[in-house]
Amino acid sequence: MSKRPISVEELIGKSQSAEVISKPKFLSKSERQKLSLQRNQEIQDKKRQQSTVNNGAKKRYNNSIEDNPEPKKINKKLKKGRNFNFDWDEEEDTSNNYQPLVRYDNRTNPPDLGLSDMHWSEKQIDDMTTRDWRIFKEDYNITSKGGDIENPLRCWAESKLPAKLLNILIKNLGYDSPTPIQRASIPLALNGRDIVGIAETGSGKTLAFLLPLFSYILSVDSNYLLYEHQQESNFNKPLGLILAPTRELALQITKEAKLFGDKLNLNVVTIIGGHQYEETVHSVRNGVHIVVATPGRLIDSLERGIINLSNCYFFTMDEADKMIDMGFEKSLQSILNYLPASEKLETTIDGKIFNIKKRITLMFTATISPPIEKITKNYLMKPGYLFIGNVGEAVDNINQQFEYFGARQSSDEILDPKKLDKLFSILRFHKDENRNYSIIIFANFKKACEELAYELSRKGFSDNTVIHGSKSQEARERAIDSFREGKDKILIATDVAARGIDIPNVSLVVNYQMTKKFDEYIHRIGRTGRAGNKGTSCTFIDDGDSEVFLDLKKFLNKGKKKCPEWLLKHSSTQSQILRD
């Protein structure tokens, strides 16, 4: 039986009651406060009832542990108030009665670990132990030999450099902390020790010898510097000499030296090929304190009497291994013979004027070869050997890539279509992936550099420039400045022309032709990945380069880099395995 429908009267009644319920009722302020107090009282009553039950259990638990618990002292300074308000009662917090075995506040009384447990960076230099220095050297990958090697430099403030030199270094030039080669070599050089520094290009060697050199000159008798050195008979007698293998490196060193020299009122002169002798004569007319030179032009200047090294007791050879490779071994020996002997300091007044007991000779090199050892033995006195990093091993921050072309197909490998197409492809990809790119392309011959520049311009890479030995000095300087300033994005160069050039932020190095000497491969790829930056190298290689395959394999294995499959399977590397 179906249910009867609702009557009209009932329907009207429900509608009226719903309207009453839905219509808001406005209360006065006093009524709202009264209602709020009533609700809060009901909540507190419920909490109090629940707390009575919990407190009974809590007291029974506390009495079973300790009859008279000691009240916990609270540091008023630390307890500024509760950060959170939970639903339960504060009396329910059992952590207030926690009794630690040892009372200790981490925030107010840090533990005294003792000097032996502190890291070397947290200690004063006088508190450093033998173990601390060993850890310090490991941190910066510094090793040494030669006996009585002084501890490295922890920071500029702890060095013995003159205050005015430190002020220029830190405040004016912004050198916050030393590099590993600077940490290791500066303390030795400041104490007059001869040094053989083995470090790669780009490790900060320039400051490693410039700072001790300027420090030495500032220690020379002030009356000599102000008066006697200014006499016409001493105008061409430098107090320090720096030799570099190439003109570009010499100019680079000069530029950095003048940052200090100009502020210290010391004259720095460059003697390199490509400049007229009259320019050198004019440069030393007002006196010279430091000479930066290449070996060949310096010997010419010495023979012509333009320069006199009789007062030069501070001598530096930068990239000495490269000077030997370029055939300057005899020139180096001749220059060393022009320098005054240490005995002169003992037998004349020079010892008091120049404030040293022996001539100081610094030599920086990437490798130790027999000619380097010969020069060291004959001309350096009990040198300290400083090894920075793993010289000769693969650089971790350089991604080394290879393009293997198998057997050499074309007699003219420069214009090989496959190699050119691959080069264009690599350059386009790198350009698209890197907004601020800077690329160096190495070739073995001057003609190859010129042909590559022409082909690149044809394919839309007109922002390239070329340097090689046949370029005039002015043209080479102009090309390097243009590349360094970013006007040209691609530099095409031979090894000799590019050795020692410090171009920051090179993002890609392309070895369009593999070098015949494997050491040069290391120097080439070292143009990128400097100062902690990541870099990429790409090397074009074929069977015609098999004479360096074994060295390349050893180099990659030693640096824990992945060897390409073609290199592992090549006959030139397999035959060595059988012999071993």
UniProtKB/Swiss-Prot annotation:
Location (main, coarse): cytoplasm
Q: Is the Nucleus keyword given for this protein?
A: yes
An example Gene Ontology biological process: mRNA processing
Please give the residue ranges the record annotates as the region Disordered: 23-75
Q: Which Gene3D superfamilies match?
A: P-loop containing nucleotide triphosphate hydrolases (3.40.50.300)
Q: Which family does it belong to?
A: Belongs to the DEAD box helicase family. DDX23/PRP28 subfamily.
Protein's recorded name = Pre-mRNA-splicing ATP-dependent RNA helicase PRP28
**Organism the protein comes from:** Debaryomyces hansenii (strain ATCC 36239 / CBS 767 / BCRC 21394 / JCM 1990 / NBRC 0083 / IGC 2968)
Taxon lineage = Eukaryota, Fungi, Dikarya, Ascomycota, Saccharomycotina
